[in-house]
């Protein structure tokens, strides 16, 4: 398994995403969670694949989309840090302040 860790906020984000989707469909919630976790594994091996978004934050993070969710991570941290996992429909800039 590639080295990475989820910040406390990212862990809560992932739990909230699962709970939200599970209200309608448990299997879909499991699938989305698994797809997010697989994307994080991919990003550990290819940390600069994501996009910088200076319009959203001055933090040295990158963004990678999985469905309507944004994995926000520090590509330079070792191990790679998943900072947040947020819905693209939310005010991401405000949530990263």
Residue ranges of model-derived segments:
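Extreme N-terminus of proteins, especially the signal/transit-peptide cleavage junction
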Residues: 1-3, 75
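Basic, Lys/Arg-enriched alpha-helical interface segments
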Residues: 3-60, 97
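Basic/aromatic recognition patch in beta-strand/loop cores that engages polyanionic ligands
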Residues: 48-78
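Enriched for short, Lys/Arg-rich terminal
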Residues: 66-69, 74-97
């Amino acid at each position: 398994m590639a080295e990475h860790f989820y910040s406390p906020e990212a862990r809560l984000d992932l739990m909230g995403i699962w709970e939200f989707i599970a209200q309608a469909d448990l299997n879909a919630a499991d699938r989305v969670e698994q797809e997010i976790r697989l994307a994080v594994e991919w990003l550990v091996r290819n940390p600069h694949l994501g996009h910088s978004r200076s319009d959203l934050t001055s933090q040295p993070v990158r963004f990678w989309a999985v469905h309507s969710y944004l994995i926000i991570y520090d590509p330079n941290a070792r191990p790679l840090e998943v900072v947040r996992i947020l819905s693209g429909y939310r005010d991401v800039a405000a949530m990263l302040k």
